[in-house]
Amino acid sequence: MVSLEKNDRVMLARQLPLESVALILAGGRGTRLKDLTNKRAKPAVHFGGKFRIIDFALSNCLNSGIRRIGVITQYQSHTLVQHIQRGWSLFSEEMNEFVDLLPAQQRMKGENWYRGTADAVTQNLDIIRRYKAEYVVILAGDHIYKQDYSRMLIDHVEKGARCTVVCMPVPIKEATAFGVMAVDESDKIIDFVEKPANPPAMPGDASKSLASMGIYVFDADYLYELLAADDKDDASSHDFGKDIIPKITREGMAYAHPFPLSCVQSDPQAEPYWRDVGTLEAYWKANLDLASVTPELDMYDQNWPIRTHMESLPPAKFVQDRSGSHGMTLNSLVSGGCIISGSVVVQSVLFPRVRINSFCNIDSAVLLPEVWVGRSCRLRRCVIDRACIIPEGMVIGENAEEDARRFYRSEEGIVLVTREMLRKLQVKQER
């Protein structure tokens, strides 16, 4: 382990990101989000009023000083590719800065797509090697969080690690969805199990397990060696969590990096924020939290901005209808281009160009771009997909049986509405 002085850390915080390339795994389908990902990859799903989920990983790279980024795509990639081309063309090729889009190469005989997360990198190794990076940062493109990757890189170098895995404690009942690890006093990973049926508890806290966040740092040459060997292993599933990390744990080459050490927070006393938003309820809840008085995730931090594709839209407008009813909102996010006419919106998130007509009551709802709500509608505890037309007088979120018959209703009572579901009800989806 190398002991670094303060000045050394400042220098490395600038130097290490320049010697690194980030690879964002963005090919996931996100099946637990149900129909919300039928036509888009999970990283391309809208979030927070104006963003896409992948904007968080991309912004973390930019804010951390990593200006060489590869985005590995696969499932329903058109929307994602279009978003990155329109919103992330700010890098300078002359300065060797870029966002490369890396689609599935289909190089394996008999294989149409990537066999696993590790194979997604393996199939692009000829391109990745050209970046001539010293370190490779592997990221998931479908998580919501703010992290300074330069701090993680410093920790990687200071520990003399060949591989670093970012981790955080999670409730033991949720740990079955993660890779779970045990570490020694130096943070060396001494055991790693991917998605165990009975997750081991952390020492001293039987209610939690130490979970991998799917964020890794590798010495580049070491990663290339690992992937070459894994590619030849017919017994491997070619996945980082299932194969690569357990292997290097057995070899004693993997170290853990506690997420709180590099999590970016405006309030140092707050709990580190990281969300998978992999289920409809988690997605709905994370969006609505941003509209609360004191949200867990600070989106107003000018020192760590989240960037996205910015459309030229007029400001949101709240108008009085002919009967004298005023458009009003409370504890809500309302994006540009929205018009609220004589209706009440409470604890909700409205994405760009949403139109709500008179006499409506919108409560705890997430309305994606271009949703049009007819007069006298009541929407509660729901997610309305992009460009849906909700007909006059429709009620959603008040009758469980009716909601389950017409739309998708989760076990927690969150209702998802899409254009296809409305068409099946003979509701015209063109205006």
Swiss-Prot record:
Residues binding beta-D-fructose 1,6-bisphosphate: 39, 419-423, 429-431
Superkingdom, taxonomy of origin: Bacteria
Gene Ontology biological process terms, A to Z: glycogen biosynthetic process
Record: residues binding AMP: 40, 46, 52, 130, 370, 386
Site feature Could play a key role in the communication between the regulatory and the substrate sites, where: 74, 113
GO molecular function, a single term: ATP binding
Identification of the protein by name: Glucose-1-phosphate adenylyltransferase
Organism: Salmonella dublin (strain CT_02021853)
Lineage, opening ranks: Bacteria, Pseudomonadati, Pseudomonadota, Gammaproteobacteria, Enterobacterales
